[in-house]
Amino acid sequence: MPEEIATLAGGCFWCTEAAFKLLRGVLEVVPGYAGGHVPHPTYEEVCTGTTGHREAVQVRFDPGVLPYADLLRYFFAVHDPTSEDRQGPDVGPQYSPAIFYHSEEQKRVAEAVMRELAPLYPKPIATKLLPFTTFYPAEAYHRDYFARHPEAPYCRFVIAPKLEKARKAFKSLLRP
């Protein structure tokens, strides 16, 4: 089976990058910016909330090891899909959750997973399902942020608890 790309926005990309690196079948995770109208945005520009971009990750994965539906179920567990412009302490349109589908098949699978999971939440799912257009990798200092700064307060109090929750809930999907 050929590799696939998933582009997902689930709040702070430091969190989502660290979360997806835990999974079997994930070959690469790149933090960056997706969905906006400003070409080659900087972090500072995206933080203004005026570029239309969301903090996102591009996940290159082997669907023979990690089916896209399982990747999405995991994604829904590591972000709050009922919150439109907020993920934990992070507020603004750049933290708005979205699935950027790369094919009609990805769109179909995402719609099915969203229907499957919707009854589990007390509020409607706010995560948007959007066609992929462009992705701009984030600046180098954002890459592997959690791995390089595990003692930073944001990493200890926001990312680490999220990863621990994911490890407990998705043991079968994790790398050995």
UniProtKB/Swiss-Prot annotation:
It catalyses: L-methionyl-[protein] + [thioredoxin]-disulfide + H2O = L-methionyl-(S)-S-oxide-[protein] + [thioredoxin]-dithiol; [thioredoxin]-disulfide + L-methionine + H2O = L-methionine (S)-S-oxide + [thioredoxin]-dithiol. GO terms for molecular function: L-methionine:thioredoxin-disulfide S-oxidoreductase activity; peptide-methionine (S)-S-oxide reductase activity. Pfam families: PMSR. It is an enzyme of class 1 (oxidoreductase). The keyword Nucleotide-binding does not apply. It comes from the Bacteria. Belongs to the MsrA Met sulfoxide reductase family. InterPro entries: Met_Sox_Rdtase_MsrA_dom, Met_Sox_Rdtase_MsrA_sf. GO terms for biological process: protein modification process. The keyword Oxidoreductase applies. Has an important function as a repair enzyme for proteins that have been inactivated by oxidation. Catalyzes the reversible oxidation-reduction of methionine sulfoxide in proteins to methionine. Its EC number is 1.8.4.11. The active site is at C12. This is Peptide methionine sulfoxide reductase MsrA. Keywords: Oxidoreductase, Plasmid. It comes from Thermus thermophilus (strain ATCC 27634 / DSM 579 / HB8).
